[in-house]
């Protein structure tokens, strides 16, 4: 199936067969009936048995099986994510990861969740820590006052982190320099901001240390 998530956090799954193949250079086809202020921000292919882990700006984690995401047509808007999980008032989803399994012991103990906050804090936790869901979510990160969770990525333990700042600077380092922590930990300094009042992390991506593609 194809899972789409919009800028305003509307989500749906659609049968892959609705996206027919077209010739290169064509006009494409309409993929959503989003409102003017909304647009498709994420689109990926998954199986119905994959898991979606959602992370909120206050540091909580919720998960859904892909088959429990409401099915829609290619042009439908989808359902608001906050209607599918028990978000606290004032909290909102900031990041997500698509996970193929949470039952394979080897996979969940050798893959990691990397989180970054706006104030430059980074945290690494084994995927195993997120393999037992609760209806009201679980703590993924203890967010310090004045900060919020920004980005999350799934890694294999050997990738490199690239954090970009609003000031135009960026830092790259191997994830092996960040030790795994428990879910309740608040993380460690990943990058020092140029100015605590005006600078902030705007993006975190995880890259293959031997990769040669452009970022």
Task: Describe each region flagged by the PLM.
Residues 1-215:
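Short, structured "edge-of-domain" segments at secondary-structure transitions
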